[in-house]
A protein has these predicted regions:
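Basic, low-complexity terminal or inter-domain segments flanking catalytic cores
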Residues: 2-5, 16, 127, 151, ...
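Short glycine-centered, acidic/aromatic-flanked micro-motifs in structured strand/loop junctions
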Residues: 81-83, 259-261, 289
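A conserved hydrophobic secondary-structure block that centers on an alpha-helix together
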Residues: 258-260, 264-271
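C-terminal or mid-to-C-terminal helical accessory/interaction module adjacent to the motor/catalytic core
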Residues: 113-195, 241-245
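Metal- or metallocofactor-binding catalytic centers and their adjacent structured scaffolds
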Residues: 217-251, 258, 424-430, 435-437
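Intrinsically disordered, low-complexity regulatory segments
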Residues: 1-140, 149, 319, 406-409, ...
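Flexible beta-alpha connector loops of hexameric P-loop NTPases
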Residues: 53-57, 264, 459
């Protein structure tokens, strides 16, 4: 009989831990959860106090059999799943399935996979914490009840094959509300005035920039102001210089890591968590699901040593950060490198980048603040109540900025000057030029993954372990899309006063460009509206946040999980019964856009079997005409003109080499048809606007590819039927009506007839 069996969640983690324990320990993986709620039915026994009905999935039976066999041959079993609620539940399921006594089985937890941490955990085991298990069990049961009862309703009332979840539905609501703010927004122009001044007494005429505190609604107002400045006097009303400090951000929590990795590295939330998981399992960083910003004394000491070594003692300053997040869970420390002295690692490019981000953020959190000088100069204008304001900021000592600067979700604005000249109150300044530029109010920005996580955290919705799955789920369900927008061109006016003359320029700019922004789909908006109308309490942000607090109370042992579920399920089930019997019509999902000027028939938009579409009704006895919406279009904001444009396909652009160029959209996307051949449009080509020259170019490219595919790379005089060709997946042998793949790494121009025949013979066996 062996001495010890340690069971962890992942094979990578098992491999790392096995290095630290001696020959008396065998380390095996459960590959995550080994049990889940039954999928055959509800999986919850409503008549037995919401008792869960668990089953072992078929793909986990072999794992369970192996672990069960090993456990029977082992004196001591150690359950070493992750230290959060999900990990505690995995430990409990293992104990139940393997027949281990709950109150005696050794449970060990560690925040980092290092030898000292593992050995310390072995020295101080505990038993399974049933409060944590019950908190996870409550979440799982509650989410199953909600999904099981809501999904059939959506099938019946909205569209088949839809589903809903408690947290996911609230996340979609956030996106829908933001989208409707954008749809309702009407951009208005205004004029922003900026001047370049210099001190009247300055022989060098050193310029500094100042902005007018007032904005103008119209060009006329802006031009009138500029004319008033021709003979005006400009005097310094206030010149103020103040020292300031900028403090480092605390070490990463799960949500701040997801946000910063999104902003700095362009990683999605799920990618960030996947990469962080790999780093953790290799023993390179601490546990990545945490809402704590605390660092251990040992980590703070290691940071100090590293800072002094790299930058000198004047850059070091220990900080003890306190976690402010309500309902912070069990994890004891922020995300940090396991070994602070290890500045770089080996690994994939993504692993290297994320580790570098974590290392810099951790070390910077223990550095001194940056010291700044902030200067403000206020300039009066004779004959006007408006003032120009110049701001400047100079870094006197970089402090933590030497290593790391936190990014934000804010749109980049106009920055103040760096160094401003020394000025005194009452001093005269002269304008080199004053410019009034037409600007436009902007709608609220769509959420990206990072800003959505931030908002969910602010509202108290979800926990470190749920942010990534929530976003992945709403995208996979088709309720939300992540997309880029190229932006549009617009012109704007710029008026510049130099001396006594005002010059006008008309310039162009791109606006509305977006990258990786989350937008609700039509079906996402319809489902959201239905759930809000029938299940208002469930969709309420405060209600959802309070449910999270109830889970926390279960974890703290303050309430029982069954009673918490009962308090929720009773009112919820009544709402389901009411919604089931309430007559709702699908007509509210149809939007009348207007009348087709050609036929005089009604044009409407709705969700059809294959997604959002527009319809022009036919005469009695005639079929209606249908067209799908373009990517990024929404039923709610679609105009009649945009809808009619969707019926412009197929478009005949005219003849080319004796055959018409016809643009259309087929099963595999937009195309140009030329006779019997088809060429796909590029992603940047719009089928509704593509011109003749571009379509002809695509046809020529397709013809060239077809010609190249038909031209052999090599032939053999001894065997004319055998040809070496280049296909879609690389070079291949064509022989007597059959094709044979050439092994990877073989140069087709150098292959011999003998080698070809050998490949053919081998393939036939």
């Amino acid at each position: 009989m062996q001495e010890n069996l340690v069971i962890v969640e992942s094979p990578a983690k098992a491999k790392t831990i096995e290095k630290f324990l001696g020959k008396d320990f065998v380390v095996k993986s459960s590959f995550g959860h080994i049990r889940d709620l039954s999928k055959k039915d509800l999986g919850v026994n409503l008549d037995k106090d919401y008792e869960p009905v668990y089953e072992i999935p078929s793909d986990k039976r072999k794992v369970v059999e192996e672990l069960s066999s090993l456990a029977k041959k082992t004196k001591t079993v150690w359950l070493a799943s992750d230290e959060d609620r999900e990990g505690e539940a995995i430990a409990w399921h293992l104990a139940e399935v393997l027949g281990l006594p709950i109150d005696q089985t050794k449970r060990i937890v560690f925040h980092e996979i290092t030898k000292p941490a593992i050995l310390a955990a072995i020295e101080s085991p505990r038993t399974i914490d049933m409060n944590l298990v019950n908190a996870q069990q409550a979440r799982r049961v509650l989410d199953r009840l909600v999904g099981f009862e809501l999904s059939p309703l959506l099938w019946k009332k909205v569209r088949p094959q839809l589903s809903a979840g408690r947290v996911q539905s609230v996340a979609v609501r956030l996106l829908v509300e933001r989208e409707r703010e954008i749809i309702a927004f009407r951009s208005t122009p205004y004029y922003r005035v900026v001047a370049q001044f210099y001190a009247a007494a300055d022989p060098d005429k050193t310029h500094f920039k100042a902005e007018l505190s007032t904005r103008f609604d119209t060009r006329e107002e802006a031009e009138t102001f500029l004319r008033s400045c021709i003979d005006a006097r400009f005097t310094v009303a206030k010149a103020e210089e103040k020292p300031a400090q900028r403090y480092p951000a605390p070490p990463f929590t799960t949500s701040t890591l997801q946000q910063e990795a999104g902003r700095k590295l362009g990683m999605s939330v799920s990618q960030t968590m996947s990469v962080a998981q790999h780093l953790y399992e290799q023993g390179l960083i601490t546990y990545m699901r945490t809402d704590s910003v605390n660092l251990s004394k040992q980590a703070i000491g290691q940071c100090k040593e590293e800072i002094i070594k790299l930058f000198g003692e004047k850059y070091s300053s220990a900080h003890n950060y306190k976690t402010k997040t309500k309902g912070a869970q069990e994890a004891h420390e922020a995300i940090r490198p396991s070994y602070i002295e290890r500045q770089t690692i080996e690994g994939t490019p993504a692993e290297k980048k994320l580790y570098d981000l974590i290392w810099k953020r951790t070390v910077a959190s223990q550095m001194v603040p940056a010291e700044l000088d902030r200067t403000t100069i206020v300039i009066d204008i004779s004959g006007s109540d408006a003032q120009f304001v110049a701001t400047g900021e100079v870094i006197r000592f970089d402090g933590f900025l030497k290593l790391y600067s936190e990014s934000t979700d804010e749109e980049p604005g106009e920055e103040g000057s760096g160094i401003l000249p020394k000025m005194a109150q009452g001093e005269s300044v002269n304008p080199a030029q004053i410019t009034a530029t037409e600007r436009f109010t902007a709608p609220p920005a769509r959420y990206n993954e990072a800003s959505l996580v931030k908002r969910l955290e602010e509202l108290g919705i979800g926990r470190p372990s749920t942010y990534a799955p929530t976003i992945t789920t709403i995208i996979n369900r088709g309720y939300v899309v992540k997309q880029n927008k190229e932006g549009q061109k617009r012109s704007y006016v710029q008026l510049t006063l130099t001396g006594s003359k005002i010059a006008e320029k008309r310039l162009t700019e791109t606006y509305g460009k977006e990258k990786n922004r989350l937008q609700p789909t039509d079906i996402g908006m319809v489902v959201n509206d239905y759930l809000e109308s029938q299940f208002e309490p469930i969709m309420d942000y405060n209600f959802t946040a309070n449910v999270e607090k109830e889970f926390d109370r279960i974890a703290d042992g303050e309430i029982t999980w069954n009673s918490m579920i009962d308090d929720f399920y009773g009112p919820f089930h009544k709402m389901v019964d009411h919604a089931t019997t309430t007559q709702t019509t699908k007509n509210n999902q149809i939007r009348i856009l207007g009348t087709d000027p050609t036929t005089g028939h009604t044009v409407k938009a709705r969700i059809g079997r294959y997604g959002p579409m527009v319809e022009i009704e036919g005469n009695e006895g005639e079929k209606s005409r249908f067209a799908s919406l373009k990517k990024g279009q929404l039923i709610e904001s679609l105009t009649l003109e945009e809808a009619l444009a969707l019926f412009s396909l197929p478009r005949n652009l005219g003849p080319y080499e004796g055959e018409d160029l016809v643009i259309g959209i087929g099963k595999f996307g937009p195309y140009v048809r030329h006779g019997k051949s088809f060429a796909s449009l590029a992603r940047t080509d719009d089928p509704y606007t593509i011109g003749y020259d571009r379509a002809a170019e695509l046809v020529r490219e397709q013809q060239a590819r077809a010609a190249a595919a038909n031209t052999p790379l090599k032939t053999f005089a001894e065997e004319p039927e055998l040809l070496i060709k280049n296909g879609r997946y690389g070079p291949y042998i064509a022989y007597k009506g059959k094709n044979y793949r050439i092994p990877k790494g073989t140069k087709p121009e150098e292959i011999t007839l003998e080698a070809c025949m050998k490949i053919i013979q081998t393939s036939k066996k």
